[in-house]
């Protein structure tokens, strides 16, 4: 039987994950910096897992196994976020300051707000993104969390950062077109990669600030 302490912590974490940041901050005005980081990591993990599961389901359903490797090595799989100076892994991320990592994470998140806003109109059969109508809200929620962390680290006066002028294309609604399938496949691949980066950056920041045993990832 699960001990009362860990069980209570798990239930609290789940409850906070279901709340938007405005409610979290309102309910816990004195939330510590470690609490803000913990919630941001939790939300990023949830979105990354959702993106990974969706990519796998889309791939399994629409992309023949023999074509997957070749497609992933074409321009279709190129993510324009790779053109910004973002660390590609944990070791590179550790060379950046927390504010640099937060700004990069913000750029990655904001580049997807447009494409994901009407995602439920694309996958209307609920084959993938069963909760697609909430993906945009979850992404906005994470954006608010990152902005909250930036305000904390910048003493409430965030500086103007780099503006990502380009965003990803919208998902194609014509699922019977091979070109549309390839485009959506590439977008889902990029979404998964960008959420993995964001989760990695947030975990690196949280671990090096608070030195937790779970830092080995």
Curated annotation (Swiss-Prot):
The UniProt entry lists the main location of this chain as: secreted
Query: In terms of domain of life, where is this protein from?
Result: Eukaryota
UniProt entry keywords in alphabetical sequence: Disulfide bond, Hormone, Metal-binding, Phosphoprotein, Secreted, Signal, Zinc
- GO biological process, any: negative regulation of apoptotic process
Q: Where in the cell is it found?
A: Secreted
Q: PROSITE patterns attached here?
A: SOMATOTROPIN_1 (PS00266), SOMATOTROPIN_2 (PS00338)
Signal peptide per UniProt: 1-26
Q: Which residues bind Zn(2+)?
A: 46, 199
- GO molecular function per UniProt: growth factor activity; growth hormone receptor binding; hormone activity; metal ion binding
Tell me where in this chain the PTM Phosphoserine is found: 132
Provide one Gene Ontology cellular component.
extracellular space
Which cysteines are disulphide-bonded?
79-190, 207-215
Family the entry assigns:
Belongs to the somatotropin/prolactin family.
Reported function: Plays an important role in growth control. Its major role in stimulating body growth is to stimulate the liver and other tissues to secrete IGF1. It stimulates both the differentiation and proliferation of myoblasts. It also stimulates amino acid uptake and protein synthesis in muscle and other tissues.
Name it. Somatotropin
Taxonomically, what lineage is the organism? Eukaryota, Metazoa, Chordata, Craniata, Vertebrata
